[in-house]
Regions:
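Alpha-helical transmembrane segments of eukaryotic organelle membrane transporters
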Residues: 2-29, 39-78, 82-83, 109-141, ...
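Intrinsically disordered, low-complexity domain-flanking/linker segments in eukaryotic proteins
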Residues: 33-36, 72-107
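Short amphipathic alpha-helical coupling elements at transmembrane boundaries
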Residues: 150-154
Length: 205
């Protein structure tokens, strides 16, 4: 069986591949291009980009959850330990934490949830992911350092602003309303839509 980080990376890559194919088909349809063809180069670039960025994003999400736990025990005398402290090399919110939640009962920690939302969706996470996207896509397309620098200056904030239409609200819904066992499905659906946008953006780089 794959480790959690490998499984998450493969899932993210599959979603990215699907979103890139959809984006290429939509772009060709808008240009009334017949017959439709899939650019293998664009497809492979997007797949490689996801393979490179999914593992650090996985670790980033775990770090956020460790520093700002999303749930707290209803009984303040109880402590729900992060799984990192229970089993060092295992996945976040695994069986041990879930068993503790069932035993003690937990509630959403709104303060920590909003901190994670702000750091990840609104500021640092959005900035780092967008910069990685522009830099890696530029390198894979053979752009010069000057051209990549120009893309960073001109495209970073427009992409971040576009992400504000999707990820902040999706993140709040995910943390506050979606059961733990269904969050991957929810985020995967949102990621598919966002992947289409990034694919269309990458095609213009």
């Amino acid at each position: 069986m794959f480790s959690p980080i490998v499984s998450s990376t493969l899932q993210a890559t599959a979603i990215a591949a699907a979103s890139n194919v959809i984006a290429q088909l939509l772009e060709q349809r808008s240009k009334q291009q017949v017959p439709t063809t899939i650019s293998a180069a664009d497809f492979l670039r997007f797949v490689i980009f996801t393979l490179l960025t999914a593992p650090p994003n996985y670790l980033w999400q775990h770090t956020l959850e460790r520093v700002f736990p999303g749930r707290k025990p209803i009984d303040s005398t109880k402590t729900v330990l992060p799984r990192y402290e229970i089993r060092e090399h295992d996945e976040l919110l695994g069986e041990d934490v879930l068993q503790q939640e069932e035993e003690f009962g937990t509630k959403l920690d709104w303060k920590n949830t909003m901190i994670k939302w702000f750091v990840d969706c609104m500021t640092l996470g959005a900035l780092l992911n967008t910069a990685a996207f522009l830099i890696l896509m530029g390198i894979m397309k053979g752009r010069s350092p000057g051209e990549i620098g120009t893309a960073l200056r001109t495209d970073t904030f427009p992409i971040i602003y576009a992400s504000y239409k999707i990820w902040p609200s999706a993140s709040i819904v995910n943390f506050a309303l979606i059961p733990v066992e269904k969050r991957i499905v929810f985020l995967s659906a949102v990621g598919l839509v966002w992947g289409v946008f990034l694919s269309l953006t990458a095609a213009k780089q």
